[in-house]
């Protein structure tokens, strides 16, 4: 039996670093990089990774074909005459849209503030390039001003970051998923270059510039997820490791180092002679950054297709997905594993028994939950595969270097990289000594109960609804108690199994393993059921439970009704700003608002991917919001008509809440409480 020390001894972070650097060779844009969904650069990187998997000794190395929308960004250069009279050429970043010029083409450029509907008043943008400021972290995503420009007839929009992302320096370009249609072209420009253009535009109003661009989106392309295996004694039971190999710019941290770490761990396991009980699968995912045109859920396309289309049989067989993102830089003061709730207790217990590992952080490693929609582990989880990821959202990197040309090895932290190698290599070894997937639903039920403690307000919730909420709280608490007792049984089984393996009593261990197949299948079935029925997202991709979203809208709508009946329009508007996607009603035209609402509600599953049926409805408040803004501007305070309209919306949400509780009650009683 291979020991933890043997596995750790064979880890080689220098190998992983070199592999991460090798991935930088493949690029669509010779100046900026980019290795995007369906591009030649992504394909060539996949071919290299396939060869690498074979060379380190993985078995059954294969290319799993998946269909995504493709994007090839070859160039975008802006030429203009500077203030000193000298010709300037600047590199532009790009978003996943289509615009191909015939060499340098002359265009008129105008500056339009933040690119909101109001910024176009009295302006003619038809056929022109529009320069705007944007803060995608604190204000709105790029698709809103881009589509506004498109509707106003602009040839393309050029965005400069005014905060939120790319804060490392004034030369930074930024890239994100566009979440909009491909026929509304968009580019990014550095703060330094935009500042010079703004000075010229202050003098002239409009400026003649020349654009040379080649950026193309093609729908329904084939790309490949690359998989390799270390076969186990139980081929039907798998542990999955995943990381994505597409990137913006050179993508050293996001996500070259993650792919390299995954293969570095694979290489160490093979070299150590580790012979697993479970089959260990290593999957380099394509099309994580973007892969679906004109969709609000346009990222994580490759992972979604891998488990929903290419290998749906993985569900019920894969006991854990260990996903990796940006593992070679320091995120805050400690390493964190971001996990689905069901794995938290197991991970906490496992961390307590770990040997001393590399001291890369001043504080000890912790587990946090739940997983988020930012990475491929969410697609895995909603398919029914329990998942986790090294947490990558702490620290300043996301605001400074993330998705810019400064994502390079200058931020590389060898000690952090080594710690993550050690941590997840040993987690694979620990999971290999389980007979039953160590899931615990207690935290799921405790969160469901805890959210029912929050006050909804006496003015708009009847006594009957209050009684219903208390009944459901007690039911969830009862389910939490049962879930913990069930987990204690699973923990005892796994401890016994691990002990038998350590003693070399493999026959008895195998007998125990086979006896528990039904128990594991049932736990995985219920995990998928819970993901299907409990887990939802709001209009910004944040993870909630179904009833939580209804309750939040009830609080906001009820509060707004109260404010309006008191003549407090500003207070009401602040609440309505938070309802669904109605924040965009304050700044953008109704056609923009309608497009980005309907494309979430009305597109088929293959366009919505992991967001399909994950939202809890929508309240269209556009006419009401714009009307209230006019009343506020005009100094009016009589808003009884608007209050009555919101009362109707409030009633709809109360009905939706009761329906949600009915659904969750049936599932909880049937599947999460001992019968």
Where do the PLM segments sit?
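Acidic/histidine-rich catalytic neighborhood of metal-dependent amide-processing enzymes
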Residues: 137-144, 148, 222-225, 247-342
């Amino acid at each position: 039996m291979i020991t933890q020390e043997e596995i750790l001894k064979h880890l080689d972070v220098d190998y992983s670093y070199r592999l991460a650097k090798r991935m930088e060779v493949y690029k669509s844009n010779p100046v900026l990089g980019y290795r995007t969904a369906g591009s030649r650069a992504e394909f060539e990187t996949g071919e290299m990774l396939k060869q690498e998997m074979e060379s380190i000794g993985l078995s059954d190395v294969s290319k799993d074909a998946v269909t995504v929308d493709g994007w090839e960004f070859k160039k975008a250069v802006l030429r203009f005459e500077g203030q000193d009279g000298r010709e300037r050429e600047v590199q532009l970043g790009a978003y996943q849209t289509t615009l191909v010029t015939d060499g340098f083409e002359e265009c008129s450029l105008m500056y339009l503030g933040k690119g909101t509907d109001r910024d176009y008043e009295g302006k003619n943008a038809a056929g022109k390039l529009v320069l705007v400021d944007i803060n995608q972290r604190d204000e709105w995503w790029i698709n809103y001003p881009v589509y506004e420009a498109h509707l106003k007839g602009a040839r393309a929009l050029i965005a400069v970051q005014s905060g939120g992302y790319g804060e490392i320096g004034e030369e930074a370009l930024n890239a994100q998923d566009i979440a909009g249609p491909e026929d509304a072209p968009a580019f990014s420009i550095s703060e330094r270059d935009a500042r010079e253009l703004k000075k010229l535009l202050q003098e002239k109003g409009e400026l003649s510039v020349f654009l040379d661009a080649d950026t193309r989106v093609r729908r329904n392309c084939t790309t490949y997820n690359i998989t390799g295996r270390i076969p186990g004694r139980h081929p039907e039971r798998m542990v999955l490791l995943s990381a994505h190999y597409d990137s913006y710019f050179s993508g050293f941290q996001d996500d070259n180092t993650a792919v390299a770490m995954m293969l570095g761990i694979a290489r160490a396991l093979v070299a150590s002679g580790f012979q697993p009980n479970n089959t260990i699968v290593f999957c380099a995912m394509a099309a994580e950054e973007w892969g679906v045109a004109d969709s609000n859920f346009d990222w994580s396309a490759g992972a979604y297709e891998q488990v929903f289309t290419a290998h749906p049989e993985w569900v019920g067989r894969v006991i854990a997905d260990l996903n990796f993102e940006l593992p070679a830089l320091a995120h805050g003061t400690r390493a964190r594993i971001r996990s689905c709730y069901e794995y938290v207790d197991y991970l906490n217990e496992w961390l307590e028994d770990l040997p001393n590992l590399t001291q890369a952080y001043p504080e000890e490693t912790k587990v946090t939950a739940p997983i988020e929609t930012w990475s491929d582990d969410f697609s895995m989880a909603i398919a029914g595969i329990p998942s986790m990821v090294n947490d990558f959202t702490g620290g300043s990197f996301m605001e400074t270097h993330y998705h810019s040309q400064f994502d390079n090895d200058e931020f590389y932290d060898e000690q952090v990289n080594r710690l993550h190698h050690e941590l997840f290599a040993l987690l694979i070894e620990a999971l290999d000594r389980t007979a039953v997937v160590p899931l615990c639903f207690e935290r799921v039920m405790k969160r469901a109960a805890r959210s029912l403690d929050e006050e909804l307000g006496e003015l708009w919730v009847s006594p009957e609804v209050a009684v219903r909420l208390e009944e459901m709280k007690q039911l969830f608490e009862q389910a939490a108690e049962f879930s913990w007792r069930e987990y204690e049984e699973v923990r005892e089984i796994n401890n016994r199994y691990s002990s038998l393996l350590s003693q070399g009593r493999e026959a008895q261990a195998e007998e125990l393993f086979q006896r528990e197949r039904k128990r594991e299948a049932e736990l995985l079935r219920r995990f998928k059921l819970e993901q299907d029925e409990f887990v939802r997202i709001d209009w910004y991709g944040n993870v909630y439970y179904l009833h939580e979203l209804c309750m939040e809208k009830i609080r906001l709508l009820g509060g707004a009704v109260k404010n309006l009946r008191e003549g407090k329009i500003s207070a009401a508007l602040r609440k309505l700003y938070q309802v669904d996607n109605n924040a965009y009603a304050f700044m953008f035209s109704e056609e923009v608002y309608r497009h980005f609402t309907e494309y979430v509600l009305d597109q088929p599953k293959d366009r919505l991917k992991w967001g399909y049926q994950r939202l809890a409805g929508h309240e269209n408040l556009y006419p009401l919001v714009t009307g209230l803004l006019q009343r506020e501007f005009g100094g009016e305070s009589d808003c009884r008509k608007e209050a009555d309209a919101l009362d109707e919306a409030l009633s709809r949400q109360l009905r939706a809440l009761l329906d949600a509780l009915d659904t969750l009650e049936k599932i909880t009683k049937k599947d999460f409480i001992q019968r």
